[in-house]
Amino acid sequence: MTVLTSAHVAREGIAVLDTAAWRACYAGVLRRHFSGAGGGTAGVSVDRVDLSTLPVRLPGVGESFGLRIAARLSSIRSHLAVRLYLDVFGFALGRSEINMEATSYVQPEPTRTEQELLLLMDRRAGLHPL
């Protein structure tokens, strides 16, 4: 959670993350960043990075975003590969920007689990308004 100067600033910060232009820019940054990842000392290369949107179902919440970053990681030595999923969610509540991340290998976290966690975060944040 990040507390900002005003509710307007929190809403604007979240709203920009839910635009196609921002996602396209961020996808390009991720692909450029990982395109040169040749393993280094970890012995792992990043073969592919994809970005997609995820639904955020929070009643009464205006600005929100959901984003999945999926990457294919390969072992330099064994050539085995695994998918990495990083799901990032955020919403504005008053002057707070609330974010949640879920990381999983092989398959993404179930949508139902993520939505239940988002609802729980929304309820808890509502109990302690800033």
Model region roles, listed by residue range:
Residues 24-27, 85, 93, 128:
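A ubiquitous, low-specificity "background" feature that marks scattered single residues
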Residues 47-124:
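A short, solvent-exposed beta-edge/loop patch
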Residues 9, 122-130:
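Sec-exported extracytoplasmic/periplasmic mature domains
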Residues 1-80:
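A small/polar (G/S/T-enriched), proline-flanked helix-loop surface module common
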